[in-house]
Amino acid sequence: MEYSWLENKLQEINRKCIQINNKKSNNDSLNMIIGKLIDVMKDTSVLFKTLYERIIFNGSYYNNLKISKADEYDLDLILVLPVALETVLMLTPEAGYVDVKIDISKIKKLAYYRDILTPLEKLCENGIFSSLKIHSWFEGLVQKSLNIINASKYFPQYKLDMYKSGPAVTLTVHTPFSSYDMDLVPCLKLDKSLYPKGYKKQNCNHIYAVSKPNKDKEWRLSFIEQELSILRDNGHVKPAIRLLKFLRDQRDHKLIKSYFIVTVAMWDLETTNFNGKSLSFAFMTLLESLYKHICERKIPFYWNPNLNLLNKCHRDYLFNLENQLLNILKKLRSSNSNPNVLNEVFNFDIQES
């Protein structure tokens, strides 16, 4: 079915309702503060200095999928284990998670690693590099480094606070005019030779594993670079994802995480060519696919379809969501080509300019 009559209205919603308040001052202060924090963390911990490689700016803002002002930033601090440790990934019973096994005995006689041997051993449990222990170590290191920065008054114009938030250590920056959060997450970079069996392979040099504070030793696999590559240069897919996120928020369905919608889009990209197609085509394709997945009670994890992203959503919630999405699709299909139906769909009144 053709939905070109929705095009102008969707473009207007995308332009007016999903604006990112991209303040250059936020970006400038963020780069300055995180740069100093990394320097102090290196000075404070020889282990961090040895393992740290770089920052990957992740999340909706940097992937151009954010639908609100730029006051939250996701930063993955990439750590690389020495090759000499002969790292091995072991799949766990929970899909999407791995144990990271290392052999510390391999570096005991290497002078270069003498200073990190003891702190590295403290982060291991029976030869497993513990996600829980490294998260606790990372949290303490950030707090200690932040205390040094605040005591030294490096940034007298800002107030810096830290608190825990899920898998991240969150740093709040209070400026004279606003505030924003930086979510810092320790993340292992792993060679592609460690790619686990049963996972879909994509052209890449690395995979990543993210520390989870609610796990004992396990790490969650992450495919940051691969997902960026999949979503890049694919017509109006990203604007359509933003519209679906906006629809989700307007309908108060926060249990449908942004990553669920991104995953639906990645599956659609395997079977649909979005290049040269309209925003209305991309939006309706993703909306109909989301509805289909909700009806099936399954959004397969893109990298391992054995994992269902909806497995923690209550069946009553999914039943209600299914009915809501069906009603939305019915309204769009029976609206006699009236684009103002989107005001009702999005619970938002917007006039075309």
Curated annotation (Swiss-Prot):
Positions that bind GTP: D183
Pfam families listed in its UniProt record: Mab-21, Mab-21_C
Cofactors required: Mg(2+); Mn(2+)
EC nos: 2.7.7.86
Catalytic EC class: transferase
Chain sites annotated for binding ATP: S60, E72, Y73, D74, K245
UniProt-annotated binding residues for Mg(2+): E72, D74, D183
InterPro entries reported for this sequence: Mab-21-like_nuc_Trfase (IPR046903), Mab-21_HhH/H2TH-like (IPR046906), MAB21L/cGLR (IPR024810)
Catalytic activity: GTP + ATP = 2',3'-cGAMP + 2 diphosphate; GTP + ATP = pppGp(2'-5')A + diphosphate; pppGp(2'-5')A = 2',3'-cGAMP + diphosphate
Keyword NADP: no
GO biological process, one term: innate immune response
Keywords attached to this entry: ATP-binding, GTP-binding, Immunity, Innate immunity, Magnesium, Manganese, Metal-binding, Nucleotide-binding, Nucleotidyltransferase, RNA-binding, Transferase
Protein residues bound to Mn(2+): L269, E270
A GO molecular-function descriptor: RNA binding
Protein function: Nucleotidyltransferase that catalyzes the formation of cyclic GMP-AMP (2',3'-cGAMP) from ATP and GTP and plays a key role in innate immunity. Acts as a key sensor of double-stranded RNA (dsRNA), the presence of dsRNA in the cytoplasm being a danger signal that triggers the immune responses. Directly binds dsRNA, activating the nucleotidyltransferase activity, leading to synthesis of 2',3'-cGAMP, a second messenger that binds to and activates Sting, thereby triggering the immune response via activation of the NF-kappa-B transcription factor.
Family under the similarity heading: Belongs to the mab-21 family.
Protein's name according to its UniProt entry: Cyclic GMP-AMP synthase-like receptor
Organism: Nicrophorus vespilloides (Boreal carrion beetle)
